[in-house]
């Protein structure tokens, strides 16, 4: 068994992902459960309220397919926000908005080819704020809806917990095996 993981820690939370290459393979079960989303006009929206959709404030392992798919969807939406706002970190090895298209296409391909359903990012998980200051005047900024989040330093915008996107096989293994999971924690109490 080969384990791959990423670890993040800050003053309030810690999280990491574990990707196993063997274990209880749920591919057939997932394909059957998500078969209503197999038609070209049907898409399963992520993140959604099926499964865990808030990560980083509780000590727990999230190993359900829906929870892992939500985690991935939230990570991708953080990158999408960076893309549409034109934020880049050229000085960093971290993922940026420039990576969004490639990673989103990878998720759609794995869901369609391996699990036989269509997936789409849930645009309603993003909200826009209008702010004002004396120098800029009115300006807008985007963030995730409060219902869906990954604690700040465990998110893709901080370059964390993205190893599932190393390859299509890694993404498939992360999603299909019950022994692959997201572990979250909190040291606030």
Task: State where each predicted segment sits.
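Short acidic, Pro/Gly- and aromatic-enriched capping/linker segments at domain boundaries
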Residues: 1-4
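Long, non-globular targeting/processing and low-complexity regions
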Residues: 6, 13-189
